[in-house]
Amino acid sequence: MFISEIQLKNYRNYEDLNLSFEDKVNVIIGENAQGKTNLMEAIYVLAMAKSHRTSNDRELIRWDEDYGKIKGRLQKRNSSVSLELNISKKGKKAKLNELEQQKLSQYIGEMNVVMFAPEDLNLVKGSPQVRRRFLDMELGQIAPVYLYELSQYQKVLTQRNHLLKAMQGKNEETMLDVFTLQLIEHGTKILQKRFEFLHLLQEWAAPIHRGISRGLEELEIVYKPSVDVSESMDLSKIKEVYYESFQSVKQREIFRGTTLIGPHRDDLQFFVNSKNVQVFGSQGQQRTTALSLKLAEIELIYAEVKEYPILLLDDVLSELDDYRQSHLLNTIQGKVQTFVTTTSVDGIEHETLKKAKTIHVKSGTVDCEIDRI
């Protein structure tokens, strides 16, 4: 799949922009704070209905405006699809082929993207929240039911936490048990989907990592749940373990006023040659692991939806050494529509970029003619 055009209205620093793209490589060039990343983010938001940079949708709307709009044309193997996302203070409304979607979960997944930004290099050494977000965003694209279960889980979690904060000195345990059972119902389904996804991701990421490391390293991805469950357990057993675990931490949760276990507390670990790369890995190994995961995402999405996703490389090439840079560009060459942001193409010598369409951005406008590198 590839996006052939995009329209932005009151989005970030773009007042009104219409732009067409090549189906292979598009390089967006400009100085910092001119709008390169905003343009890249707009493509991501069009696909995912949320930003990778902020959870506050108001920040996506141009200053002093009441609404923002992103509209794009997606070309797929057997169809052409119009996507539109309208953002206001009241929330977001999505359209597919001009038809408004009742739920965002019905919209997400139509256009698949893989974002690789400098913060993704922190996937290994960053906080557990970074890794959970990675899981949620990628899984949500290929499994709409996961997004539904996740949104329901988060609603119940918020209600349960409010109750826990208010419980000290009050007898509200009956209501707490109701929320606990609801949390277990949605949480176990989330857990199962994560186990399935990571099994597939492992199958793709391990050989990719082996290739980048010239056969010297073996990558293993391990899911670390906050309760003592495993992939081999069936759904009823997982629910049973969750229930027992919630009973054992109930008084601590009431004392602390928050939910202490569940998928929102889980984590991932990455092992290279049986060593925890987060703790013992070099910066090079950590970056190879992050790169392997991103390249594996591309192949996994293709295996699931039979279309390659759109790859967004936001100021990340300069963060990779020449070898990893070349491996990345060689892998995607000719098969994945790719967007690259950079302040300059100097020092990036690769055939893929020489054939790219370049877009020069300055102060929220496409400042000059589109040309070739």
Curated annotation (Swiss-Prot):
GO biological process, one term: SOS response
Location(s), subcellular: Cytoplasm
UniProt keyword list: ATP-binding, Cytoplasm, DNA damage, DNA repair, DNA replication, DNA-binding, Nucleotide-binding, SOS response
GO cellular component: cytoplasm
One Pfam family in the UniProt entry: SMC_N
Stored PROSITE patterns: RECF_1, RECF_2
Main location per the UniProt record: cytoplasm
A molecular function (GO) term: ATP binding
CDD domains: ABC_RecF
InterPro entries recorded: DNA-binding_RecF, DNA-binding_RecF_CS, P-loop_NTPase, RecF/RecN/SMC_N, RecF_2
Family to which the UniProt record says this protein belongs: Belongs to the RecF family.
NCBIfam families according to UniProt: recf
General function of this protein: The RecF protein is involved in DNA metabolism; it is required for DNA replication and normal SOS inducibility. RecF binds preferentially to single-stranded, linear DNA. It also seems to bind ATP.
Name the UniProt record assigns to this protein: DNA replication and repair protein RecF
Gene of this entry: recF
